[in-house]
Amino acid sequence: MAGCRELELTNGSNGGLEFNPMKEYMILSDAQQIAVAVLCTLMGLLSALENVAVLYLILSSQRLRRKPSYLFIGSLAGADFLASVIFACNFVIFHVFHGVDSRNIFLLKIGSVTMTFTASVGSLLLTAVDRYLCLCYPPTYKALVTRGRALVALGVMWVLSALISYLPLMGWTCCPSPCSELFPLIPNDYLLGWLLFIAILFSGIIYTYGYVLWKAHQHVASLAEHQDRQVPGIARMRLDVRLAKTLGLVMAVLLICWFPALALMGHSLVTTLSDKVKEAFAFCSMLCLVNSMINPIIYALRSGEIRSAAQHCLTGWKKYLQGLGSEGKEEAPKSSVTETEAEVKTTTGPGSRTPGCSNC
């Protein structure tokens, strides 16, 4: 409760406009602050660029936009992009520059970080369910998972993520409830509720992926039986196996990147944390940013359709740049006065058109 009294004194001094989220949360040394600034900046920029590239490839391809699977992947890329920008900026401002915000602005920032990471996990769950339906009900998959239903599922997931994440901004804060030792103004009971919600999402992902990977194993066995003869639908089976392995890799990366931070959050609910543990949590939190950075790499390396879209996009840009180069050569200055005078006589004759009009 001492933290609550400190908050009340701080907020009451200037109506909350000079709210400083407790110095006890700003525990990094100068060397650690430099490391956080460098790592967050580099990983945040790289992750943002990667996810923007994935979003652009999906949105610019009419074929990919029509497929529910890539709508879910696009949602994941969008959530990871927002997480990269919002988390990296706010993390550096808080731990490195010790930024001062009003109470509501601070809760808005931490709620935005929570929403983006929650939506990322939610998008991964929807992607897993999509693969589950594709492998378990292939004849009726297209009827079950339509583009409209995919958009509705994504809308519900994003709204639910936002609602849960912004509960502290809507009034669910600490004081008189016990404050979290890891997050200013966040009560332990809210943190417990959010951890339970994330645990449900992870349980769904693990169960779904386990079943998907088991089905993929069956498909591999089926491929081995028919490897010496052509079988209708064999290419589709190989696609499903490849996607299942990709999603299994994503799940493994997700658990490796998230488990340390989630474990320390749960540990903070039952015991008092030392500064060393809080410092460890600060760096473990950046593993979530690593997850956002790795996801698009996995898709780019393992999704043939996204690679094809990237090659098509690069070919288009190459032709465009070559066209600009050829236009520059055509507009090079004349080599002699006689050549220039001859062109002037030609363009000023009856019925002549200027170069600008000829392009219209």
Curated annotation (Swiss-Prot):
Keyword Magnesium: no
InterPro entries reported for this sequence: Canbinoid_rcpt_2 (IPR001551), Cnbnoid_rcpt (IPR002230), GPCR_Rhodpsn (IPR000276), GPCR_Rhodpsn_7TM (IPR017452)
Modified residues (Phosphothreonine): 338
Carbohydrate-modified residues: 11
Function in brief: Heterotrimeric G protein-coupled receptor for endocannabinoid 2-arachidonoylglycerol mediating inhibition of adenylate cyclase. May function in inflammatory response, nociceptive transmission and bone homeostasis.
Taxon lineage: Eukaryota, Metazoa, Chordata, Craniata, Vertebrata
Biased amino acid composition, Polar residues: 349-360
Residue ranges of the TM segments: 34-59, 72-92, 105-129, 150-172, 189-214, 247-267, 280-301
Post-translational modification (record): Constitutively phosphorylated on Ser-352; phosphorylation increases cell internalization and desensitizes the receptor.
A GO MF label: cannabinoid receptor activity
Protein species of origin: Rattus norvegicus
Phosphoserine: residues carrying this PTM: 335-336, 352
The entry's keywords: Cell membrane, Cell projection, G-protein coupled receptor, Glycoprotein, Inflammatory response, Membrane, Phosphoprotein, Receptor, Transducer, Transmembrane, Transmembrane helix
Protein name: Cannabinoid receptor 2
